[in-house]
Amino acid sequence: MKLTAEQIQANWQKFLANIKEHISGNRGEQLLNFYKRYEERIILMPAAHKKEYHNAFPGGYVEHVNRVVAASLKIYDVWCEFEMDKSTFTIEELVFSAINHDLGKMGDEENESYIPQTDKWRRDKLGEDYMFNKKVPFASVPDRGLFLLQSHGIQYSFNEMLTIQTHDGLYDEANKKYLFAFMPEQKPRTSLPFIVHQADLMAARVEFEREWLPKLKGKQGSLDKLKENYTLGTTPNSSKKLSTKTKALSSMKSDGLKNMLDKL
């Protein structure tokens, strides 16, 4: 999978629009300022380091987050239809949690988490187009994301903290203390974490199906061929329309970002 420059730009505008529409007051401004500060990094981030995972290509992170936001709002309606207690959280908390659920993947203020893999063998044999940046101290994705928010003065509610912390559900052993409880007083007192987890799970699954099901059916060559590095742009995209790309690039203020996207 490879996104064009205009697709990446459109996804970024949608990402910012979600903040403007759903995050109110001073916190909304703080969140916009935070993401604009790290725009050149976040706009090209992959959602994962390995192409067998979901959206492991430039721009994959923002596309994934947008999908999780949209899915969260749809799944909210389903839960409401089945008589969920809507009074336990707000739509703003829902969207804030979805937007920031994977924020920890950006790394720290100085260094990005995912950098291009330098080991050819690992790229070709293990499908690792990216590797983890050793300059970034270890932290789980939820912990780092919450730290980044608070270190930039962006406040979050208990509901939002719990949801970001547990968005991987019981796939993450660390979440058992919150989700694997039997006593009523120990269970989450809102359905918000379950909605965002289901949205994230569905988004990742859809992204897997889009990338891999046609290939596994043999429509695009053998699996050995599919192990080749393709997500970082080794396969040219002949469908690009220069005029559309030029229009997308012309709307950007950052010369550095224009240069990066122009090479896609």
Named regions from a protein language model:
Residues 229-236:
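Extracellular secretome segments
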Residues 32-90:
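A glycine-rich, hydrophobic loop/mini-helix early in the fold
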Residues 1-18, 198, 202, 212-222:
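N-terminal leader/capping segments at the start of a protein or of a new domain
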Residues 245-264:
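Short linear clamp-binding motif
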Residues 1-47, 51:
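Non-catalytic interface/linker regions that flank or bridge core catalytic/transmembrane domains
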Residues 54-57, 63, 75, 81, ...:
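Divalent metal-dependent catalytic cores for phosphoryl transfer on phosphate-bearing substrates
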Residues 223-225, 229:
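Catalytic or ion-coupling anion/metal-binding cores of large enzyme and transporter domains
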Residues 227, 241, 245:
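Intrinsically disordered, low-complexity mixed-charge segments
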